[in-house]
Regions:
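Nucleotide-activated sugar donor-binding and catalytic core shared by glycosyltransferases
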Residues: 1-408
Length: 408
């Protein structure tokens, strides 16, 4: 780990100033950046601690059932949930309030991680998806504290990056006590990176369990309008989506843009206004869709599920650019026809399943999306309900099965 730590110290000023800039730019309390040096000013735990590390919103939402199960199985422990992003932090607070402890995960500098582990002394650590922090895992291993990677995934892009730096990571993957991954390709990649093949297993994604039951739609008066919910969009996807929408010959259609990071809203408004369009802001319309405007922009977090329940079709963002896509499952829960761009490597197996079931259509241009939306808007409502219902039910339960895999 010496070479890794040396390189990390060299590039750390860049990491720090980037983090500080984002904190100031998006209005976060600058004091919270001290948590990333493991200076924590909140309440401490007098109970044994179980640590769950979820990088951002997606992992936080996906782990809801898993967190509930931990609380049931370990009633004498305190749960500490860490993340690295402001939106992830806000989501943790909104979902759990004071029922869990929360702070940012410190930078993976050795002295920061040592201080963090000294403060909390986690009895068990669960790392979600792809959050491989070499010093965290190495020090937990040295201290003989259990560390598990759960709901793990490893895209081809991440795999190739890890292969390049493996010589300086001191076989970090072999130090995981057990790994539960989401797909066959993930399993093969983890083993190739050094995970012990006897301590890894494949199961379905926790995201299937995060879909709350019952599947009910909001009581929404759409007045004959058809909603296209474009979820978790990234720059510059909004411009492509607005262009596709402008080519639609459907006077009843409304485009609803839900950016992955709401702090980008002011820039999105400027970009859309350059196209001669003035969108309605969700926060300015009593947190409701403005049916009198053809383009709505959601500038609040926590409303995506409700919006999907009102939708006719859905587009999933992070896919028109090389970001690997976002979660398809919340849209699938409401049996919506789905579209996306061609970049969905973060959800490869799910995307391939949905394409085979003719639920997901893929287009990487405004012209292609326009044609897809025309077809989907004219489809029979709920015609895919049976397919989606069976697909989801067959894949639920991974959050509970994880504890059997881990013998906990």
């Amino acid at each position: 780990m010496r070479v890794y730590n040396f390189v990390l110290v060299i590039i750390f000023p860049l990491i720090f100033f980037r983090s500080l800039y984002k904190s100031l730019k998006f209005g976060e309390n600058p004091k919270r950046i001290m948590e990333k040096f493991s200076f924590y000013g909140g309440k401490k735990s007098f109970k044994p601690v179980i640590l769950i590390h979820a990088v951002s919103v997606g992992e936080v939402l996906a782990s809801r059932k898993f967190v509930e199960e931990i609380k049931k199985r370990f009633p004498d422990h305190q749960t500490l949930i860490t993340c690295t992003t402001q939106t992830g932090s806000e989501t943790i607070k909104r979902l759990y309030g004071d029922s869990v402890l929360h702070q940012y995960m410190p930078f993976d500098l050795k002295f920061c991680i040592k201080r963090f582990l000294k403060n909390w002394k986690p009895e068990i650590t669960f790392i979600l998806e792809t959050e491989i922090w070499p010093n965290l895992i190495n020090l937990l291993h040295v201290q003989k504290r259990k560390v598990f990677l759960v709901n793990g995934r490893m895209s081809e892009k991440s795999f190739n990056r890890y292969k390049l730096v493996m010589p300086i990571l001191d076989n970090v993957f072999s130090k995981l006590d057990f790994t539960i991954c989401q797909g066959t390709k993930d399993l093969k990649r983890f083993i190739e990176l050094g995970v012990n093949k006897d301590r890894v297993i494949k199961d379905y994604s926790f995201k299937f369990d995060s879909l709350s039951i019952p599947n009910e739609r909001d009581n929404f008066e759409n007045k004959g309008k058809k909603l296209i919910i474009c979820a978790s969009t990234h720059d510059p996807e909004e411009k492509i989506l607005v262009k596709a929408f402008s080519m639609l010959n459907n006077e009843n259609a409304i485009l609803v843009l839900v950016p992955r990071h709401p702090e980008r809203v002011s820039k999105i408004i400027k970009d859309i206004k350059k196209l001669g369009i003035n969108p309605s802001l969700f926060s300015k319309n009593n947190l409701k869709i403005d049916l009198s405007n053809t383009i709505n922009l959601i500038d609040e977090i926590g409303y995506l599920e409700s919006l999907f329940s009102q939708a006719n079709i859905a587009f999933i963002g992070g896919s028109l650019i090389p970001r690997g896509g976002q979660n398809f499952l919340e849209a699938l829960k409401f049996s919506l026809p789905i579209s996306s761009g061609e970049s969905f490597y973060n959800f490869q197996e799910i995307a391939e399943d949905l394409i085979e079931m003719d639920i997901l259509k893929v287009g990487n241009s405004a012209e292609k999306l326009k044609l897809i939306w025309e077809e989907q808007l004219n489809s029979v409502p709920n015609q895919i309900y049976e397919k989606t219902d069976n697909y989801l039910k067959q894949r639920m339960g991974a959050s509970q099965r994880a504890f059997k895999h881990l013998s906990l």
